[in-house]
Regions:
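Replication-associated primase and helicase/ATPase modules
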Residues: 22-24, 54-66, 75-131
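Short, charged/polar "capping" segments at the starts of alpha-helices
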Residues: 49, 71-76
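Low-complexity, compositionally biased segments
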Residues: 11, 16, 33, 71, ...
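Phosphate-handling DNA/RNA-contact segment within nucleic-acid enzymes
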Residues: 1-61
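Residue-level "edge-of-site" marker
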Residues: 44, 69, 95
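Anionic group-transfer/hydrolysis microenvironments
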Residues: 28, 68-70
């Protein structure tokens, strides 16, 4: 569960390139596996009032969502929130792995290249598939 201070933290902010797409993952080890410009959200939720969400919205960078398969509904909620702010969102298929940390960097990069764009048109279809 997210602690009260997590919404005010952007993990590794000083090392992020805010002019390039970012990858959102759940934990620190997932971020290591995902490579450069990856941000652990330190849980499976990203609230609109969090510092990270606000910075993404302010910078307008594309987002690759690579949350654990058991957080599919939460990933779709995050995607919908980002879409409301005009952010381009891609969903990285992590299954059948438990999380990004179980993959090699090469496996993750391959899946990232194959990521599906999430749009208002495809959101309902992807939400239905997650049921």
């Amino acid at each position: 569960m997210n602690g009260p201070g997590n919404k005010d933290i952007i993990f590794n902010d000083l090392y992020l390139d805010w002019s390039a797409p970012v990858t959102l993952v759940e934990g620190v080890f997932d971020a290591i596996g995902a490579g450069d410009n990856s941000i652990p959200i330190l849980g499976s939720t990203l609230r609109k009032d969090s510092k990270l969400f606000q910075k993404i919205a302010d910078k307008g960078v594309s987002v690759y969502l690579a949350l654990d398969p058991d957080a599919e509904k939460k990933a779709l909620h995050i995607a919908r929130s980002l879409l409301e702010y005009g952010i381009e969102v891609y969903k990285v298929d992590v299954s059948p792995y438990k999380d990004v940390g179980e993959m090699t960097k090469e496996q993750f990069q391959y899946r990232k290249k194959k990521a599906e764009i999430v749009s208002n048109d495809t959101f309902l279809l992807q939400a239905a598939q997650s049921i």
